[in-house]
Amino acid sequence: MKFLLTTAFLILISLWVEEAYSKEKSSKKGKGKKKQYLCPSQQSAEDLARVPANSTSNILNRLLVSYDPRIRPNFKGIPVDVVVNIFINSFGSIQETTMDYRVNIFLRQKWNDPRLKLPSDFRGSDALTVDPTMYKCLWKPDLFFANEKSANFHDVTQENILLFIFRDGDVLVSMRLSITLSCPLDLTLFPMDTQRCKMQLESFGYTTDDLRFIWQSGDPVQLEKIALPQFDIKKEDIEYGNCTKYYKGTGYYTCVEVIFTLRRQVGFYMMGVYAPTLLIVVLSWLSFWINPDASAARVPLGIFSVLSLASECTTLAAELPKVSYVKALDVWLIACLLFGFASLVEYAVVQVMLNNPKRVEAEKARIAKAEQADGKGGNVAKKNTVNGTGTPVHISTLQVGETRCKKVCTSKSDLRSNDFSIVGSLPRDFELSNYDCYGKPIEVNNGLGKSQAKNNKKPPPAKPVIPTAAKRIDLYARALFPFCFLFFNVIYWSIYL
């Protein structure tokens, strides 16, 4: 019994919730219908009769009660001339990767519709400002942007549409739009390039027999001073044209276009690309002044230069569209990369010369011959012998010193008898038995002392012999690399600037 009561209670609750939800939904629909605007031609006679006879609303109702927005003005007669002009609020920078640009504009269209002539009993100004909701009740040109990628209206806080109806039947519509337009770029001279971006306004359904777009005389595109991050755009560089197109099977369609000329500012790329890569190339030349046998310093310097330039090339390639032709910036980066790589190759050639046994032996022979020619050969050896017998003087002196100093001095008088000047510098409490006649400490168990240790000491390692050819390559590179790079700069900037 309890189970049945619980089930019935739950069923009642679910029915009540469903009914409340349906009522709320219907009320929302009702509210939407109340907000919906009906054109005078769609209103009933009773609704129209409620409007005061002398009011502006009544005049509009009289104009539109028999108005059919599906039929163009001058139907089966002369084509409708639509005068177009544009006011540019903002101009977004060109995106190289997607090849497009974004603008925010006021699009204004003006045409004459004889059916909308204000009656003679209308008392007021020559133009009647109408609520934007009435825009849908009128016939309007089917204008679209031929090179548009995306676009949107603005409706904050209300729909950004302005509608004027003039006494003679002229209609002026102004609307605010944000449009992304395609702009095919020619990046051959990038970043010293100048781009021409178009905005094409075309009729979608009406041929030239029914509709014609015409630029407003004088100044059809108003452009205030706009600062772009990478480009310069001037009002004098704006061009206007006619782009009427023929489509097979349908005919000719009216089209007008405006062309913006944008000149790129090179300052960003000078500071961000050209200056750093130039310094990296100059940095790679420092290896020419480093000793050829210092591979630990020269190799990392060359590798660092090449990797830095390669990284710069990769970074810029990711920011630019993948085009099949060579850009001006590509020429610069490739040249810098080649100069950096050439400095690394130059050191490889120097190393080959440095490690060539034949060249090393030839260099040793040349040095010996030069020393002999300078008098550092036989005469020097003769002067350094004892009485010319061939025994070196320092060896004879060492032998005599060892003979004289085999006995250990036992008193300071022994040191004085040998006339050594170091006696005064000896400490007072020194052990005479531990000093030889020279006043130097000796080992008790080794009578030879330090004289033998000096004889057994290894001679210092000989300095590496660097062939003249290796030095000559570095010498030539110091002048050749800067000269070639300077010559490349003269040619490069004379072509692309």
Swiss-Prot record:
What GO terms are given for molecular function?
Answer: extracellularly glycine-gated chloride channel activity; extracellularly glycine-gated ion channel activity; glycine binding; protein-containing complex binding; transmembrane signaling receptor activity; transmitter-gated monoatomic ion channel activity involved in regulation of postsynaptic membrane potential
Could you name the domain of life of the organism this protein comes from? Eukaryota
* Bilayer topology annotation: Multi-pass membrane protein
Marked site positions, Important for obstruction of the ion pore in the closed conformation? 307
Question: Which positions carry the signal peptide feature in this UniProt record?
Answer: 1-22
Q: Which segments sit on the Extracellular face?
A: 23-268, 316-327
- How is the activity of this chain controlled? Channel opening is triggered by extracellular glycine. Heteropentameric channels composed of GLRB and GLRA1 are activated by lower glycine levels than homopentameric GLRA1.
Q: Which PANTHER family match?
A: NEUROTRANSMITTER GATED ION CHANNEL (PTHR18945)
This chain's protein is named Glycine receptor subunit beta
Q: Which organism is it from?
A: Homo sapiens (Human)
Q: What is the lineage of its organism?
A: Eukaryota, Metazoa, Chordata, Craniata, Vertebrata
What's the name of its gene?
A: GLRB
